[in-house]
């Protein structure tokens, strides 16, 4: 199951399943990855800074609703797809008269480290900002914010894309949760 949104300024997705915050640090394959856990009385979610990805949705009984990954098939849980959903023909696209974009399937966000901007027991905001490395692939001054907010029986996920540049910035955004 995947959902995609193209050229949107803000999108929201709700997952529902029938107050506590924790932050842990893991070092996986050279990445310094931070996990954030959000909890209320009915649901808990785990988020990781690598890719700003949701990695677990559990109800109060501990039932897991999100695919936990299997490298033999697919190791992801719910990657964020940005600035493209799917792939580009021949891996590149020219936008306007001179902007060339080049990246693999589903863009670049899922493989980059996000910064935890703010958090509480039931809400976390992760941010990915353009830098010299991202501009080599996607030549725009962007910021992607992932906002995760617990509801009574689920999690509300908001994608906020900010264009810090002065030219139009085409993009697609999507989520790829597996259940």
Segments predicted by a language model, with ranges:
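Short, Lys/Arg-enriched N-terminal segments with co-localized hydrophobic residues
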Residues: 1, 5-7, 15-32
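Surface-exposed acidic/polar loop and edge beta-strand patches at domain peripheries
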Residues: 27-158, 164-170, 177-179
């Amino acid at each position: 199951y995947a959902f995609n949104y193209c050229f949107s300024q803000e999108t929201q997705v709700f997952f529902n399943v029938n107050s506590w915050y924790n932050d842990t640090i893991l070092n996986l394959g050279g990445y310094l990855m931070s996990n954030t856990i959000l909890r209320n009385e009915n649901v808990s979610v785990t988020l990781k800074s690598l890719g700003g990805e949701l990695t677990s949705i559990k109800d109060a009984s501990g039932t897991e609703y999100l695919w936990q990954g299997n490298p033999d098939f697919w190791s992801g849980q719910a990657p964020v797809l940005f600035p493209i959903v799917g792939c580009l023909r021949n891996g590149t696209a020219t936008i306007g008269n001179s902007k060339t974009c080049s990246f693999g399937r589903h863009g670049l966000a899922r493989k980059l480290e996000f910064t935890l901007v703010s958090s509480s027991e039931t809400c976390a905001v992760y941010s990915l900002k353009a830098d010299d490395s991202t501009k080599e692939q996607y030549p725009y001054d962007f910021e992607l914010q992932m906002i995760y907010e617990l509801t009574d029986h689920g999690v509300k996920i908001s994608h906020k894309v900010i264009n810090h540049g002065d030219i139009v910035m085409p993009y697609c955004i999507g989520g790829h949760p597996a259940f």
